Swiss-Prot record:
Cellular component aspect of the GO annotation: cytosol
Classification lineage: Bacteria, Pseudomonadati, Spirochaetota, Spirochaetia, Leptospirales
SUPFAM superfamilies xrefs: YebC-like (SSF75625)
Keyword Plastid: no
Transmembrane segment boundaries: none
Pfam family, one: TACO1_YebC_N
Family: Belongs to the TACO1 family.
Listed NCBIfam families: PRK00110.1, PRK12378.1, YebC/PmpR family DNA-binding transcriptional regulator
Protein name: Probable transcriptional regulatory protein LA_0720
One GO molecular-function entry: DNA binding
Subcellular location: Cytoplasm
InterPro entries, alphabetized: Integrase-like_N (IPR017856), TACO1_YebC-like_2nd/3rd_dom (IPR048300), TACO1_YebC_N (IPR049083), Transcrip_reg_TACO1-like (IPR002876), Transcrip_reg_TACO1-like_dom3 (IPR026564), YebC-like (IPR029072)
Broad class of where this protein is predominantly found: cytoplasm
Record's keyword terms, sorted: Cytoplasm, DNA-binding, Transcription, Transcription regulation
Length: 249
């Protein structure tokens, strides 16, 4: 898992430079709207909405934006209707990719995702052929300068976390989905701020790539998928071979 995590760290640094706050708010807002539409606007009785709000707060989304997104979902405000899409994909070198999206028009989003895949050596897969290679986990990323690893392990495991991964400048805290909210609360109570926090797919087994050209194609593909306006998350089982790590620092 370490190689995959190192790639995730490389990509996270790039995203910190390239991402725009407005785009992040739009994505999270869609997730809140869908959650409110499916389970109602009360976060106390809608766990999914509660988690979406926690995610919004973790990226400092203004309270007004959050409330507006909820009202759109409950029908109190007029707006477009969103639906969720999950795309199972294969990429260059046979890697597996899971793409989650929220869209107001699936008939537009699906061909666009397919086009990105085709242009960069990927393809859509049949349902179940890729998802079986992943499992859902709570993932919380925070800067390591905030706390020592030993202290974080005590706090996170005490809150129900399964694992704490030290990636140098960041820690990655992993939990089962049912414990995600409890772990996040424990970290917040400690005064720790997360850079990312969500329930997402993570690979059961990584696929190591040692060919530089293939690795470059994979990275470009993941970046383009992640950059699509409707995409909320992209996860792959791509692991960069240690022999190539310096090439992408």
């Amino acid at each position: 898992m370490s190689g995959h995590s190192k790639w995730a760290t490389i990509k996270r640094k790039k995203d910190a430079i390239d991402s725009k706050r407005g785009a992040i708010f739009t994505r999270v807002g869609k997730e809140i709207t869908v959650a409110a539409k499916m389970g109602g606007g009360d976060p106390e009785g809608n766990p999914r909405l509660r988690l979406a709000i926690l995610k919004a707060k973790s990226v400092n989304m203004p309270k007004d934006n959050i409330e507006r997104a909820i009202r759109k979902g409950t029908g109190e405000l007029e707006g477009v209707t969103y639906e969720e899409c999950l795309y199972e994909c294969f990429g260059p070198g046979g890697i597996a990719i899971m793409v989650s999206a929220v869209t107001d028009k699936k008939s537009r989003t699906t061909p666009e995702i397919k086009s990105i895949l085709t242009k960069l050596g990927g393809s859509l897969a049949t349902s179940g052929s890729v998802s079986r290679l992943f499992e859902k986990k709570g993932v919380i990323v925070l800067e390591s300068s905030q706390i020592s690893e030993d202290e974080l392990v005590d706090v996170a495991v005490g809150g129900g976390a399964e694992d704490v991964i030290n990636e140098g400048d960041v820690y990655r805290v992993i939990s089962v989905p049912d414990n995600y909210e409890t772990v996040l609360h424990a970290l917040n109570e400690k005064g720790l701020k997360s850079e990312e926090s969500e329930i997402r797919y993570i690979p059961l087994v990584s696929s190591e790539i040692a060919d530089k050209e293939v690795a470059e194609k994979i990275m470009k593909l993941i970046d383009q998928l992640d950059g699509h306006d409707d995409v909320t998350s992209v996860t792959s089982n791509f692991e960069l071979a240690s022999s190539l790590e310096k090439e992408f620092e």
